[in-house]
Regions:
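Bacterial N-terminal signal peptides
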Residues: 9-17
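Detector for methionine-enriched segments
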Residues: 1, 14, 35-38
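Bacterial N-terminal signal peptides that target proteins for export
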Residues: 1-8
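N-terminal secretory-pathway/extracellular module detecting exported/lumenal segments
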Residues: 23-171
Length: 171
C-alpha cells in the first residue's frame, strides 16, 4: 500500500514539475502564432530556419527615395523563437557602389557589397536583403546563384566588399 502511495505521490510531483515547462511550451507556441498573424501583408520571406534556432527573415515596406532613385528604404522582419525585431534600413542599388546600411545600439554599419560576386557566409544576409530591396523580382533567391543576372543588370561582380563601422556616442 505504501508503494502505491509513493508512486501516486511521485506522479503528482512529476506532473507539478512538468506543468511549468508545458505551460512555457504552450506560451511559446502561442507567441509564435501571434507573431505569424502579425506579419505585414507585403512581407516577403527571404530566409527561414527551423528547429531550436527558429528564425524568419523578411522584408516589407520597401520605398524609393524621391531625391535619389538608387536608394531604397525598408523594414526588416527578424522573427526569432522568442523575439521579434523590426529595424528600418536602407540600401544603395547603384552599379558603382552597392551597399547596405544597418545599425544597432552601438554603431552604424556601412557594408559595400559585390552583387553576383563571390561572397562569404557572413555576408549572405546582406546580399539577400540587398537583392530583395533593389530587385524585388529576385527576392528570396540564393544570392550565390545570381552572378549571371548581376552581370546582365550591369554589375561588375568584381567589386571589393568591405565594412565601415561608425560608432555611436555612449549614452
Amino acid at each position: 500500500m505504501q508503494s502505491i502511495r509513493w508512486i501516486f505521490g511521485l506522479g503528482l510531483v512529476m506532473s507539478a514539475a512538468c506543468q511549468p515547462a508545458l505551460a512555457e511550451a504552450l506560451n511559446r507556441e502561442q507567441l509564435l502564432e501571434q507573431m505569424k498573424a502579425m506579419r505585414p501583408v507585403d512581407l516577403v520571406v527571404l530566409d527561414q530556419s527551423d528547429g531550436a534556432d527558429e528564425y524568419t527573415l523578411g522584408i516589407f515596406a520597401v520605398s524609393g527615395d524621391p531625391a535619389d532613385p538608387e536608394l531604397r528604404r525598408f523594414k526588416l522582419w527578424q522573427e526569432y523563437a522568442d523575439n521579434l525585431v523590426i529595424p528600418t534600413e536602407s540600401v544603395n542599388c547603384s552599379r558603382e557602389e552597392p551597399l547596405r546600411v544597418t545599425r544597432d545600439t552601438e554603431a552604424i554599419y556601412v557594408r559595400k557589397l559585390n552583387p553576383g560576386g563571390s561572397q562569404r557566409a557572413s555576408t549572405r544576409e546582406d546580399h539577400l536583403v540587398w537583392w530583395a530591396a533593389c530587385h524585388p523580382e529576385l527576392a528570396g533567391q540564393d544570392p550565390a546563384g545570381l552572378a549571371d543576372k548581376a552581370r546582365e543588370l550591369g554589375y561588375s561582380t568584381e567589386l571589393i566588399e568591405s565594412q565601415e563601422v561608425l560608432r555611436l556616442p555612449a549614452p
